[in-house]
Swiss-Prot record:
Belongs to the ATPase delta chain family. It comes from Nocardia farcinica (strain IFM 10152). Pfam families: OSCP. The lineage of its organism: Bacteria, Bacillati, Actinomycetota, Actinomycetes, Mycobacteriales. Transmembrane segments: none annotated. GO terms for cellular component: plasma membrane; proton-transporting ATP synthase complex. F(1)F(0) ATP synthase produces ATP from ADP in the presence of a proton or sodium gradient. F-type ATPases consist of two structural domains, F(1) containing the extramembraneous catalytic core and F(0) containing the membrane proton channel, linked together by a central stalk and a peripheral stalk. During catalysis, ATP synthesis in the catalytic domain of F(1) is coupled via a rotary mechanism of the central stalk subunits to proton translocation. Keywords: ATP synthesis, Cell membrane, CF(1), Hydrogen ion transport, Ion transport, Membrane, Transport. The gene is atpH. This is ATP synthase subunit delta. It comes from the Bacteria. The keyword Hydrolase does not apply. InterPro entries: ATP_synth_OSCP/delta_N_sf (IPR026015), ATPase_OSCP/d_CS (IPR020781), ATPase_OSCP/dsu (IPR000711).
Length: 269
């Protein structure tokens, strides 16, 4: 994002914080309604452009949003939306992406208030791995030719009775926006949930499954390095031969046999 959109995003997030009261029901409603608003904006380009048109005063854009969505969403959601559309965004897509992020944060807030954030984070990670490991499922969920409603219905059917309501809502939103980065989108959501708990996420690829003791030791070691609690998400990858690869943000620690062989190859070249 450029500076204008970063400032607009910050002010919109402040509006979200002010709108949420600590009640998981208010947060859940706000998150779901923001997703519904985004669905409308995705479908109606003219409205999307009008609400982000910087040549029109912010107050007029706010009035337009109230005419379109007033009475159809809660007071909290309307307050967030009014603030967001009144800002000057560098790009229309920045406004829509921020509304998506605010919806995600509101739903994660509701999970935190209900004491279910840990479960949601774990489910999002595991769902991302399941999709990444199933080419047919990934294709079905990322197929731009398939209607968004059909993809939302598919993921809801797969998760029914197996996942937290917040996880299902977040998953439906991800697959409904025609992204081709399904696995990465779920990783980002899992990271967002961890950040909500003031933790960082270590994405670990290991040649074999780690025991609970090994995971705990790894998390403790990484916490000493990064100075914050670390959530360890492990994906088994036999192609590494032995050892593991740890990714935290842009940092990569490669302790795998394949990595060591590659470094040796470069040294000998």
């Amino acid at each position: 994002m450029y500076a204008a959109s970063r400032e607009a995003s910050s002010r919109s997030r402040e509006a979200l914080r002010a709108a949420l009261t600590g009640s998981d029901s208010v947060a859940a409603t706000t998150g779901s309604e923001l997703f519904a608003v985004v669905a409308v904006l995705d479908d109606q380009r003219s409205l999307r452009v009008a609400l982000a048109d910087v040549s029109v005063p912010g107050s007029a854009r706010a009035e337009l949003s109230e005419r379109v969505f007033g009475g159809k969403v809660s007071v909290a959601t309307q307050a967030v939306l009014t603030t967001a559309v009144a800002q000057n965004w560098s790009r229309t897509s920045d406004m829509v992406d921020t509304l998506v992020l605010l919806g995600q944060e509101a739903l994660l807030e509701s999970a935190a208030n209900a004491g279910r954030l840990d479960a949601v984070e774990d489910e999002l990670f595991r769902l991302g791995r399941i999709i990444a490991d199933n080419a047919d499922l990934e294709q079905a969920l990322s197929d731009r030719a398939k209607p968004a409603a059909a993809k939302r219905e598919l993921i809801a059917r797969l998760l029914a009775g197996k996942a937290e309501p917040v996880t299902i809502s977040l998953a439906e939103q991800v697959v409904g926006r025609n992204t081709t980065r399904i696995g990465a989108a779920f990783d980002e959501l899992s990271d967002l949930a961890a950040a909500r708990r003031d933790q960082i996420v270590a994405h670990v690829r290991a040649a074999i499954a780690l025991t609970s003791q090994q995971r705990e030791r790894l998390a403790a070691s990484l916490q000493r390095i990064y100075g914050k609690p670390v959530t360890v998400h492990v994906q088994v990858d036999p192609s590494l031969l032995s050892g593991l690869v740890v990714r935290i943000g842009d940092d990569v620690i490669d302790g795998s046999a394949v990595g060591r062989l590659e470094r040796l190859r470069r040294e000998l070249a």
